[in-house]
């Protein structure tokens, strides 16, 4: 595979060197397109840039998500963007009825609309104290998740008992649930604007809790950051100037979503195919 980029005296990319078992060589090229993976399989890069992914989650990727493409681009003067961001998720739904409950942190506070896309919810979980969170539902809305990714902790006859068992400050969960129930009964959520179809008072005991905490739920994820590029896939330097002859597309280029909270499944497919085509066309024109 590729080992390093070759630059000419002006700093433009002029080719690439390669190694295949014991053989080595170089290829002269007017344009080089890096179309490689992210860096989720590179433990050193993950620890340096996205430590949450290094703690517990199951990584989503393949052996070629080793960050080589990004490192090649950086070696030629390329800048990176969003390297500290990651897609990480452990969906508690389906069934959708679970989204009528509330998700709270270890302080008993809500922090996200429960009907958010699952990676957005998970991204906010990562921001909470100790990356700990719980999904709370009452008996009327309790069902088992269809995917066994979040652990059922237990059920309690009163909210006060649940609050104590989960180690939350006295009165915190009671106040949060009372506030939520008051507005949910009216079909409103002034705090996080959850859609009315997912609003329902959780006021019929007993109450159950599912553990969404990092290290308890089965999270999976991948990296979002990569080389900075323009609309033609040209790799940019730290001053946002294109590096002549160098292009990048796919997971080695920074994602359109910019962070895991803004990512939606399939985004990489769209950006990879669209900007890959633009990069290829521009590189071909540059090579004439």
Residue positions per predicted region:
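Residues forming the flavin
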Residues: 1-178, 182-288
């Amino acid at each position: 595979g590729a080992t390093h980029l070759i630059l000419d005296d002006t700093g433009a990319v002029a080719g690439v060197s390669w190694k295949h078992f014991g053989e080595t060589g170089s290829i002269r090229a007017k344009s080089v397109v890096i179309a490689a993976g992210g860096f989720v399989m590179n433990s050193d890069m993950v620890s340096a840039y996205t430590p949450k992914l290094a703690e517990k989650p199951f990584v989503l990727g393949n052996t070629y998500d080793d960050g080589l493409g990004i490192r090649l681009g950086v070696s030629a003067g390329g800048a990176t963007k969003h390297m500290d961001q990651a897609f990480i998720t452990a969906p508690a739904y389906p069934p959708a009825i679970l989204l009528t409950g509330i998700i709270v942190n270890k302080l008993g506070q809500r922090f996200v609309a429960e009907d958010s896309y699952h990676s957005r919810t998970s991204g906010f979980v990562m921001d909470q104290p100790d990356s700990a969170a719980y999904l709370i539902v009452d008996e009327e809305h309790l069902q088992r998740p269809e995917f066994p990714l979040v652990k059922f902790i237990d059920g309690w006859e009163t909210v006060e008992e649940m609050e104590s068992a989960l180690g939350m400050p006295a009165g915190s969960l009671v106040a949060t649930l009372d506030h939520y129930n008051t507005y949910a009964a009216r079909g409103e959520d002034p705090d996080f604007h959850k859609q009315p179809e997912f609003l329902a008072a959780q006021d019929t005991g007993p109450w159950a809790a599912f553990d969404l905490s990092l290290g308890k739920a089965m999270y999976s994820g991948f990296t979002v950051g990569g080389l900075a590029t323009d609309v033609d896939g040209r790799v940019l330097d730290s001053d946002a100037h294109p590096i002549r002859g160098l292009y990048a597309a796919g997971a080695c280029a920074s994602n359109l979503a910019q962070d895991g909270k803004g990512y939606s499944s399939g985004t990489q497919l769209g950006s990879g195919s669209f900007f890959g085509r633009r990069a290829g066309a521009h590189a071909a024109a540059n090579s004439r």
